[in-house]
Amino acid sequence: MFASTTPSEFNRALMAKVEVRKQQGLWSDAVAELGRVRTFALSEDELEGYYYQRALCSYLAADFEGALAAIDEARFALYDTVALARMELIEALAAGEKGDWERSQMAARRVVAAMPAEQQAEMEQRLNEIYSKAPRMRSPELAWWLSMVPGLGQLYAGEVWSGVVSLVANGALVTFGVGEIVAHHWLSAWLGAGGLLSTTYFVGQERARILTERRNQRVLREHNDLLRAELLK
């Protein structure tokens, strides 16, 4: 590659290296190599292959934002609608991984439109059912703020048992602290109940945020597993 005397020769050597990285399953490395391609020296056909490989390798490297960016660039750079159609499947899957259901469904519809006519109605019906059940992402930040009321953030995250435990634990500490104050045991109220309450309270807030993030990841993964299985049949 270092002996290449023209941009075209450099690109051919680089694309050969990309193929090696793909065969090795090193998708991130393949994306990095594609980033070195001198696109100004590519023909229309080569440019089509370049964007397709960038989108595909980015998706397989779990760089879904990168896959969608490659497809967006291809729409400006390519005039061949057939070439763009090759990327519709990647767009539907990558947008789904980002939780962009509207973009994902639009791309999936274009995938279905390219299928044989006798398959379209059934496939569209199954996809509509999947997209109708697309999960809504919950806000980790909102979960943190809701946890100012002990247990409420965990309930928002869908962790009922964790929320009940947090509510009971913090309630017990408050009850103990009030009892110690009434009994004029100021030191034990401050060091015991107060110290433990501050620990469980703030830990509970952070835990609610983490639980919400995990919930989002889980429902997103489950839904995209269904979508991928349907589109790759």
Give the role of each language-model region.
Residues 1-132:
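Alpha-helical protein-protein interaction scaffolds
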Residues 26, 46-52, 56, 63, ...:
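Hydrophobic alpha-helical membrane segments
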